[in-house]
Amino acid sequence: MISIFSKLKQGLSKTSGKISAGIDKIFYKKKLDAETLEELEELLISTDMGSLVAAKIIEDFKSLKFDKEVETTEIKETLANLIEQQLLESEIPFTLNENKLNVVLVCGVNGAGKTTTIGKLAAMYGMQGKKVAVAACDTFRAAAVNQLDSWVTRAKALLITGEEAADPASVAYRAVEESIKQDIDILFIDTAGRLHNKKNLMDELTKIVKVIKKVDENLPTHSVLVIDAITGQNTYNQVEHFNDATNLTGLIVTKLDGSAKAGVIVGVVQRFNLPIYFIGIGEQIEDLKIFNRHDFAKSLVGL
């Protein structure tokens, strides 16, 4: 059976291959100097880590003492440690309240893997003995409800739907009330995939939050944005706009196994101080992993 760390290394191979090969090329029979550090900074920026984060890491490199001739393994180990330090804010756990309904609002753009992620989470917590419900609030797209139904059936969870084209906020409100009646532990609210720059759709998300607060002002327990690692630089705009609409508590990053831009995780954590709750590194339910900054940093540089 493949270990979690091995699976993570495999999933991050596109980005780590780029970084590892880049370091090997930059430092082949060369020393750590202004020229090679500039090349390393450009390499980090190319993974969508962001110029500010890359510059900070390079500054930290400059403060360390190296021999004139430096081994690439030493560079990679140092880089992994410095990346891990940049991720200090990232490892806040996805905590749930005991003996009380937890409502998790899940949002994201079309194609980010939002519905699939909800299905995996429903299965994960169902296997832990939790009573799980899912509210289908993408009411204008029948295919979304069908996709969700397939996942929820596999997870043995309760699916709460509304009429086609019903007000998503009203479906969310009814789902919260129904979940309380049925002693549900976790209610995941699946929302319509939307572009972050479409104001009317973002307003709909804000309305859902306001409506469920009428049941309990402490809800939702979590507002989570699912982001696709392949998106790269546009991720920063997504996080900013969805955070404005829903006051995000954390992120889930999907499709890391298909991206050479996984450095974006480091940049997003630094810019928004939001934790990464889970990462997706494959299609199977077990491929949704709790984020571990140490393992991520090592895997990112190919160690």
Curated annotation (Swiss-Prot):
SUPFAM superfamilies assigned: Domain of the SRP/SRP receptor G-proteins (SSF47364), P-loop containing nucleoside triphosphate hydrolases (SSF52540)
Superkingdom field: Bacteria
EC number(s) recorded for this UniProt protein? 3.6.5.4
For whether the record's keyword set contains Cell inner membrane, the answer is: yes
Top class in the EC scheme: hydrolase
Q: Name one GO cellular component term.
A: cytoplasm
> According to its UniProt record, where is this protein located?
Cell inner membrane; Cytoplasm
Q: Give the membrane topology, semicolon-separated if more than one.
A: Peripheral membrane protein
Give residues annotated as binding GTP.
108-115, 190-194, 254-257
Extract the signal peptide range: none
Q: What's a GO biological-process term for it?
A: SRP-dependent cotranslational protein targeting to membrane
Task: Tell me the keywords, alphabetical order.
Answer: Cell inner membrane, Cell membrane, Cytoplasm, GTP-binding, Hydrolase, Membrane, Nucleotide-binding, Receptor
Keyword Cell membrane part of the UniProt annotation: yes
Q: Which GO terms describe its molecular function?
A: ATP hydrolysis activity; GTP binding; GTPase activity; signal recognition particle binding
Q: Which reaction does it catalyse?
A: GTP + H2O = GDP + phosphate + H(+)
Q: NCBIfam families per the record?
A: ftsY
Q: Whom does it interact with, and what assembly results? A: Part of the signal recognition particle protein translocation system, which is composed of SRP and FtsY. SRP is a ribonucleoprotein composed of Ffh and a 4.5S RNA molecule.
What's its job?
Involved in targeting and insertion of nascent membrane proteins into the cytoplasmic membrane. Acts as a receptor for the complex formed by the signal recognition particle (SRP) and the ribosome-nascent chain (RNC). Interaction with SRP-RNC leads to the transfer of the RNC complex to the Sec translocase for insertion into the membrane, the hydrolysis of GTP by both Ffh and FtsY, and the dissociation of the SRP-FtsY complex into the individual components.
Similarity-based family: Belongs to the GTP-binding SRP family. FtsY subfamily.
Q: Can you name this protein?
A: Signal recognition particle receptor FtsY
Organism expressing this protein natively: Rickettsia bellii (strain RML369-C)
According to the entry, what is the taxonomic lineage of the organism? Bacteria, Pseudomonadati, Pseudomonadota, Alphaproteobacteria, Rickettsiales
What gene makes this protein? ftsY
